């Protein structure tokens, strides 16, 4: 699995790393690293055609350090992801599924 931290070790509001590549069906573990409330929203305008962004998003907040959400993406292409409360601070990432 690929691990993506929600929040940098330095307390930054960021996905770390901000770009990953995965094989179709490979697990992606989103882990709250900082204890700030974060969520994982797939941008409906930035996912491959036919993908239901709402179905793969995790809208609830991960509030505690160590809380984890796992997603597996099966449709190849590029996915845009953001954290709803911190999108204005630039908390966004890109996932490329091979």
From Swiss-Prot:
Q: Which GO terms describe its molecular function?
A: copper ion binding; electron transporter, transferring electrons from cytochrome b6/f complex of photosystem II activity
What is the top-level taxon of the source organism? Eukaryota
Does the keyword field hold Zinc?
no
Question: Where does the UniProt annotation locate this protein?
Answer: Plastid, Chloroplast thylakoid membrane
**UniProt cofactor(s):** Cu(2+)
Main subcellular localization, coarse class?
plastid
List UniProt keywords, sorted A-Z. Antiviral defense, Chloroplast, Copper, Electron transport, Membrane, Metal-binding, Plastid, Thylakoid, Transport
PROSITE patterns reported in the protein's UniProt record: COPPER_BLUE
GO terms for biological process?
Answer: defense response to virus
Q: Give membrane topology per the record.
A: Peripheral membrane protein
Cellular component GO terms held in the UniProt record: chloroplast thylakoid lumen; chloroplast thylakoid membrane
Q: Which residues bind Cu(2+)?
A: 38, 83, 86, 91
Query: Does the record's keyword annotation contain RNA-binding?
Result: no
Explain the purpose of this protein: Participates in electron transfer between P700 and the cytochrome b6-f complex in photosystem I. Has antiviral activity against Potato virus Y (strain N).
What family is it from?
Belongs to the plastocyanin family.
Q: What name goes with this protein? A: Plastocyanin
Recorded source organism is Ulva pertusa
This chain is encoded by the gene named PETE
């Amino acid at each position: 699995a690929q691990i993506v931290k929600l929040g940098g070790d330095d307390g930054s509001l960021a996905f770390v790393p901000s770009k990953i590549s995965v094989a179709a069906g490979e697990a992606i573990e989103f882990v709250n690293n900082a204890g700030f409330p974060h969520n994982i929203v797939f941008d409906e305008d930035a996912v491959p055609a036919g993908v239901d962004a709402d179905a793969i998003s995790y809208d609830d907040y991960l509030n505690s350090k160590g809380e984890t959400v796992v997603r597996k993406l099966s449709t190849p292409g590029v996915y845009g992801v953001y954290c709803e409360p911190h999108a204005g601070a630039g908390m966004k990432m890109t996932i490329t599924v091979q």
